[in-house]
Amino acid sequence: MNYILDNNTIETINNTYLTIHTNIIEKLNFFIEKKSIPHIIFYGPSGSGKRYILNNFLNKIYNNNKQIIKEYVMYVNCAHSKGIRFIRDELKFFAKTNIQNQNGLFFKSIVLFNAGNLTTDAQSALRRCIEQFSHTTRFFIIIEDTNLLLKPILSRFCNIHIPLPIIDNNRISLHNIQKKIV
């Protein structure tokens, strides 16, 4: 079922995502306050707001500075044939350097979408990369099913489940919302 909504309603739903997931947002804010941000896996059904919540989290970490985010956050969609060579070369090269932002947090961020599509060898290389560069880089994974990841990767991450929000006794997915053309 698709919902056709106007721009004001879509903004309300976007704010509702943050309202519904307050316990998750509070946990993420706690990490920022303590300046102790772990590697995090956001998992849950498609359309639950995982990407939205992560982007808000990264904006808070980097003080909404789009230039810093562009320079120090790497987004990777693993559904596009990313293998062990990509992990060993490009991802490792990005992770090598460190930074300091205004909050005193010393790290770059790598966001991996659909990491379950990585081969077993690529996931093993990712695990080694996480171990080697955890002092300069934080890894964030967005995935629907954590069973697709190797257990050694799961054990190095804080796992946060993002359920579909329920609004008016209906589960609402962002994928089922279309903007009303005015």
Task: Name what the model sees in each region.
Residues 1-182:
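P-loop/Walker A NTP-binding region and its immediately flanking N-terminal helices
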